[in-house]
């Protein structure tokens, strides 16, 4: 009787579940560990950059993505699904919002639009749920720094610190012990690296870790000068060398 419902996307089982969403969450749990930490002056998102082969060019792999100059995302689960969501998120931010209002959307608004896209995939014929969970970090003038988790069902929640993927249970336990209300961005980076170190198998260095921050505005990243009113982006990926320098200080 269970199989009768497990392959139906839009039919609830007698226990009140949608089997395909459970399978999508299983795909998330099989993915590498990703985490996010909110600090008083920024947000950190980080993940393991795991290559399927030592012959692969790891520098071309990217699991942390810029959605707007002040919002970034990381995922656990299926990479192709993530890339589709990144493209859709950027389209919403640029075409559906910035082109109309002249500015990028607040973090919560963009998160809700991404969640809507994911939710629609749970009740539409001919598609399947996205096999990915997202951690979206950002800053806006209304809410300051924020961190959200979006699941395949379309549910989303704000977090102080959280983790997704196969090592999420142990990572959350570690974060609960380390996080506090006065945590600053640099300390959050160290905690993120310490947390990932517990779950990463094999080499642990700047080439196998991807980490980004939402911090202060950085005019140097604009690529041009001479327009004082233009603010620099807050999203920035740390280089491999920057990560290695911090690992040496742990």
UniProtKB/Swiss-Prot annotation:
Recorded hits in SMART domains, A to Z, give: Proteasome_A_N (SM00948)
Say which domain of life the source belongs to: Eukaryota
Q: Where in the cell is it found?
A: Cytoplasm; Nucleus
Q: Name a single GO cellular component.
A: nucleus
**InterPro entries, sorted:** Ntn_hydrolases_N, Proteasome_alpha, Proteasome_alpha-type, Proteasome_asu_N, Proteasome_sua/b
One Gene Ontology BP term is: proteasome-mediated ubiquitin-dependent protein catabolic process
| Gene3D superfamilies, per the entry | Glutamine Phosphoribosylpyrophosphate, subunit 1, domain 1 (3.60.20.10)
User: Is Nucleus set as a keyword in this record?
Assistant: yes
Q: Which SUPFAM superfamilies match?
A: N-terminal nucleophile aminohydrolases (Ntn hydrolases) (SSF56235)
Q: Sorted alphabetically, which Pfam families does this protein's record hold?
A: Proteasome, Proteasome_A_N
Disulphide connectivity of cysteines: none
Entry keyword set: Cytoplasm, Isopeptide bond, Nucleus, Proteasome, Ubl conjugation
Q: Where is this cross-link: Glycyl lysine isopeptide (Lys-Gly) (interchain with G-Cter in ubiquitin)?
A: 108
Q: Which residues form the signal peptide?
A: none
Additional record remark: Present with 7060 molecules/cell in log phase SD medium.
- State whether it acts alone or in a complex, and with which partners, per the record: The 26S proteasome consists of a 20S proteasome core and two 19S regulatory subunits. The 20S proteasome core is composed of 28 subunits that are arranged in four stacked rings, resulting in a barrel-shaped structure. The two end rings are each formed by seven alpha subunits, and the two central rings are each formed by seven beta subunits. The catalytic chamber with the active sites is on the inside of the barrel.
* Protein family according to the UniProt entry: Belongs to the peptidase T1A family.
Q: What does this protein do?
A: The proteasome degrades poly-ubiquitinated proteins in the cytoplasm and in the nucleus. It is essential for the regulated turnover of proteins and for the removal of misfolded proteins. The proteasome is a multicatalytic proteinase complex that is characterized by its ability to cleave peptides with Arg, Phe, Tyr, Leu, and Glu adjacent to the leaving group at neutral or slightly basic pH. It has an ATP-dependent proteolytic activity.
PANTHER family linked: PROTEASOME SUBUNIT ALPHA/BETA
Q: What is this protein called?
A: Proteasome subunit alpha type-2
Q: Which organism is it from?
A: Saccharomyces cerevisiae (strain ATCC 204508 / S288c)
- Which gene is this protein's source? PRE8
């Amino acid at each position: 009787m269970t199989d009768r419902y497990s392959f139906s996307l839009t039919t609830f089982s007698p226990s009140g579940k949608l089997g395909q969403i459970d399978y999508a969450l299983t795909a998330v749990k099989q993915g590498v560990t990703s985490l996010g930490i909110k600090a008083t002056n920024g947000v950190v998102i980080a993940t393991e950059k795991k290559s399927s082969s030592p012959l692969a060019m790891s520098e071309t792999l990217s699991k942390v993505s810029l959605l707007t100059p002040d919002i970034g995302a990381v995922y656990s689960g299926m990479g192709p699904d993530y890339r589709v969501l990144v493209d859709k998120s950027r389209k919403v931010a640029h075409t559906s919002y910035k082109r109309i209002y002249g500015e990028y959307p607040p973090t919560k608004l963009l998160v809700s639009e991404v969640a809507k896209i994911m939710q629609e995939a749970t009740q539409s014929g001919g598609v399947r749920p996205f096999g990915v969970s997202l951690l979206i970090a950002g800053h806006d003038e209304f809410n300051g720094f924020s961190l959200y988790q979006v699941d395949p069902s379309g549910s989303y929640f704000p977090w102080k610190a959280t983790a997704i993927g196969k090592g999420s249970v142990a990572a959350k336990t570690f974060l609960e012990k380390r996080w506090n209300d006065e945590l600053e961005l640099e300390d959050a980076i160290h905690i993120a690296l310490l947390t990932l170190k517990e779950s990463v198998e094999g080499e642990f260095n700047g080439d196998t870790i991807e980490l980004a921050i939402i911090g202060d505005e950085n005019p140097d990243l604009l690529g041009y000068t001479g327009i004082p009113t233009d603010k620099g982006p807050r999203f920035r990926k740390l280089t491999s060398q920057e990560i290695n320098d911090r690992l040496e200080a742990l």
